[in-house]
Amino acid sequence: MSKIFVNPSAIRAGLADLEMAEETVDLINRNIEDNQAHLQGEPIEVDNLPEDMGRLHLDDGKSPNPGEMAKVGEGKYREDFQMDEGEDPSFLFQSYLENVGVQIVRQMRSGERFLKIWSQTVEEIISYVAVNFPNPPGKSSEDKSTQTTGRELKKETTPTPSQRESQSSKARMAAQTASGPPALEWSATNEKDDLSVEAEIAHQIAESFSKKYKFPSRSSGILLYNFEQLKMNLDDIVKEAKNVPGVTRLAHDGSKLPLRCVLGWVALANSKKFQLLVESDKLSKIMQDDLNRYTSC
């Protein structure tokens, strides 16, 4: 008579399968009970429902009565009229700008000049905004000018720290004296030229964003500083850089900019750390020399 031997590991595996099957059955039963929980307990009386629930009715295919629909408070149903994220114009505009940025990088890698790429891109963005964000009716140009004036007055009335003003005034006065009168206000009459100037300034600053420049330190040493340490957006840096005498004219001509002078100017106006570390008198002379050298070329 032959004997049948059973491997103990097979027995243990079979017991484990039985335990898993029992747990699965228990889980299914609990799910069924949870799904049928609304069938248990006391029945709900229709008369005891809240007042808003009494307005609910089954759709029989007929159009609802406008009088009854008007009684419902608009504030309770504002969420129903909110657009999805995909339908939000600002979300679509953000996606469009991301695609534009990718396209600019590709064109620059292909060897095209940034100034040419930027001028074309600006026109495309303006066209996109004009088509997808039309001006709302009922607002005249007078309202826009009034709002703009209000914002400008608000900016002018914002107090500035006296310490920042006193430390940066010396360098700015020296730079003004060195370069003569400010650049001509050609940008006020030619918007495309103004955009091209900003693009040229942004391009040159971006190329040397992490490059460190030498400045005189208060400890009789050398202070190394770069645009990246400003912790500012490139657009804000460009706006401040346009205030440096002669920079706008140099950018319009496509000449190289005195980036160390620009960095010192922007840092004096926006970085308290730079103001505390730099020697302002020596910095004024350095900025003056840089402006003289670049504007005389």
UniProtKB/Swiss-Prot annotation:
<keyword id="KW-1035">Host cytoplasm</keyword>
<keyword id="KW-0597">Phosphoprotein</keyword>
<dbReference type="InterPro" id="IPR037199">
    <property type="entry name" value="PP_M1_C"/>
</dbReference>
<dbReference type="Pfam" id="PF03012">
    <property type="entry name" value="PP_M1"/>
</dbReference>
<comment type="function">
    <text>Non catalytic polymerase cofactor and regulatory protein that plays a role in viral transcription and replication. Stabilizes the RNA polymerase L to the N-RNA template and binds the soluble protein N, preventing it from encapsidating non-genomic RNA. Also inhibits host IFN-alpha and IFN-beta signaling by binding and retaining phosphorylated STAT1 in the cytoplasm or by inhibiting the DNA binding of STAT1 in the nucleus. Might be involved, through interaction with host dynein, in intracellular microtubule-dependent virus transport of incoming virus from the synapse toward the cell body.</text>
</comment>
<dbReference type="InterPro" id="IPR004259">
    <property type="entry name" value="PP_M1-like"/>
</dbReference>
<keyword id="KW-1176">Cytoplasmic inwards viral transport</keyword>
<dbReference type="GO" id="GO:0039723">
    <property type="term" value="P:symbiont-mediated suppression of host cytoplasmic pattern recognition receptor signaling pathway via inhibition of TBK1 activity"/>
</dbReference>
<dbReference type="GO" id="GO:0039563">
    <property type="term" value="P:symbiont-mediated suppression of host JAK-STAT cascade via inhibition of STAT1 activity"/>
</dbReference>
<keyword id="KW-1177">Microtubular inwards viral transport</keyword>
<keyword id="KW-1090">Inhibition of host innate immune response by virus</keyword>
<feature type="modified residue" description="Phosphoserine; by host">
    <location>
        <position position="63"/>
    </location>
</feature>
<dbReference type="InterPro" id="IPR049506">
    <property type="entry name" value="RABV_P-like_C"/>
</dbReference>
<keyword id="KW-1105">Inhibition of host STAT1 by virus</keyword>
<keyword id="KW-1106">Inhibition of host STAT2 by virus</keyword>
<dbReference type="GO" id="GO:0042025">
    <property type="term" value="C:host cell nucleus"/>
</dbReference>
<feature type="region of interest" description="DYNLL1 and DYNLL2 binding">
    <location>
        <begin position="138"/>
        <end position="172"/>
    </location>
</feature>
<keyword id="KW-0899">Viral immunoevasion</keyword>
<protein>
    <recommendedName>
        <fullName>Phosphoprotein</fullName>
    </recommendedName>
</protein>
<feature type="modified residue" description="Phosphoserine; by host PKC">
    <location>
        <position position="271"/>
    </location>
</feature>
<feature type="modified residue" description="Phosphoserine; by host PKC">
    <location>
        <position position="162"/>
    </location>
</feature>
<dbReference type="GO" id="GO:0039502">
    <property type="term" value="P:symbiont-mediated suppression of host type I interferon-mediated signaling pathway"/>
</dbReference>
<feature type="compositionally biased region" description="Polar residues">
    <location>
        <begin position="158"/>
        <end position="170"/>
    </location>
</feature>
<feature type="modified residue" description="Phosphoserine; by host PKC">
    <location>
        <position position="210"/>
    </location>
</feature>
<dbReference type="GO" id="GO:0044423">
    <property type="term" value="C:virion component"/>
</dbReference>
<keyword id="KW-0922">Interferon antiviral system evasion</keyword>
<dbReference type="GO" id="GO:0075521">
    <property type="term" value="P:microtubule-dependent intracellular transport of viral material towards nucleus"/>
</dbReference>
<dbReference type="GO" id="GO:0003968">
    <property type="term" value="F:RNA-directed RNA polymerase activity"/>
</dbReference>
<keyword id="KW-1223">Inhibition of host TBK1 by virus</keyword>
<keyword id="KW-1114">Inhibition of host interferon signaling pathway by virus</keyword>
<feature type="region of interest" description="Disordered">
    <location>
        <begin position="132"/>
        <end position="189"/>
    </location>
</feature>
<keyword id="KW-0143">Chaperone</keyword>
<dbReference type="GO" id="GO:0030430">
    <property type="term" value="C:host cell cytoplasm"/>
</dbReference>
<keyword id="KW-0693">Viral RNA replication</keyword>
<feature type="short sequence motif" description="Nuclear localization signal">
    <location>
        <begin position="211"/>
        <end position="214"/>
    </location>
</feature>
<dbReference type="GO" id="GO:0043657">
    <property type="term" value="C:host cell"/>
</dbReference>
<feature type="compositionally biased region" description="Basic and acidic residues">
    <location>
        <begin position="140"/>
        <end position="157"/>
    </location>
</feature>
<keyword id="KW-1225">Inhibition of host TLR pathway by virus</keyword>
<dbReference type="GO" id="GO:0039722">
    <property type="term" value="P:symbiont-mediated suppression of host toll-like receptor signaling pathway"/>
</dbReference>
<dbReference type="GO" id="GO:0039564">
    <property type="term" value="P:symbiont-mediated suppression of host JAK-STAT cascade via inhibition of STAT2 activity"/>
</dbReference>
<feature type="short sequence motif" description="Nuclear export signal">
    <location>
        <begin position="49"/>
        <end position="58"/>
    </location>
</feature>
<keyword id="KW-0946">Virion</keyword>
